[in-house]
Amino acid sequence: MSRRRRRRRKRRNPAGRLIALVLTLVVAGGAAAGGIWYYAEHSGNPLTEYADEKYNADLYRAEPFSETLCVSAENVALDGFTDEPSLHAAGLFNLNERSVEYGYRLYDKLYPASTTKLMTAYLALKYGKLEDMVTVTDSVTGFAADEVVCGLYPGGQVKLYDLLCGLLLKSGNDCGVAIAEYISGSVEAFAELMNEEAKKLGATGTHFVNPHGLHEDDHYTTAYDLYLIFNACIQNDTFKEIISMSSYTMSIGDAAGNTHSLEVLPTNYYSLGKTE
């Protein structure tokens, strides 16, 4: 990491066994995750003995998809907590124990709003280069007055890293568009990539239309899918670095060679220390 970035960032029985396996598949399938396990016991059948010898090697074994995930197929009560009627859906996931501590309507369809930006960030980190300079297009304009932007302008030159900071800290919708065009060439192509990658993560109850989350009827997800996406994001150290910042100063270059600075503050009250 360059010194410049450091300066700009501020931190703060056989049958019985077979049934058990089938049930495991049902649970995993209900959680938008899939895995196939096969178990059988053989006694003296040459064909099965050959199969065991030739095909039971580690080369042919794969880790079940949900092995490292928190999985639940139904609501999970939390001792001492009564479901809040105002909640559309909620989940509390213990990543260390890989368990769902609380789950309420985990698989109900909901509109993700700005949590959409998690998927945008995930793809930027997966396919982009942080030091790449991104040229901003006219697509970043036209947002309504009450829709959050970082102040990007057509022709501006911004590093992908800075766009990620604006996206994740301030929830800048313009940064989401700039990232989408950088990765895929257009918002529409990026939305297709978002949907492909969401399915790879097991988020099969999700469909994206844009990179920022501004409401569209065909743009939706579930609480559990959001967990899957966020869980994928936090495997990346840069993602964790950015969301831990208390502020960041973006640099935007113009056609004349001038550089403009823009401080972005988190819209997350936890990051700002305004709540506990």
Annotate each language-model stretch with its function.
Residues 41-224, 228, 233-237:
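Active-site-adjacent loops and short helices of periplasmic peptidoglycan-processing enzymes
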Residues 14, 78-79, 153, 255, ...:
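Intrinsically disordered, low-complexity segments enriched in small/polar residues
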Residues 2, 159, 186, 266-267:
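Secondary-structure junction/capping motif
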Residues 31-45:
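Membrane-interface motif at the C-terminal end of an N-terminal transmembrane signal
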Residues 20-33:
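Hydrophobic membrane-insertion alpha-helices, especially the h-region
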Residues 1-18:
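N-terminal Lys/Arg-rich, disordered targeting/topogenic segments
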Residues 203-204, 217-220, 224-276:
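Domain-terminus/edge residues, biased toward the C-terminal soluble/receptor-binding domains
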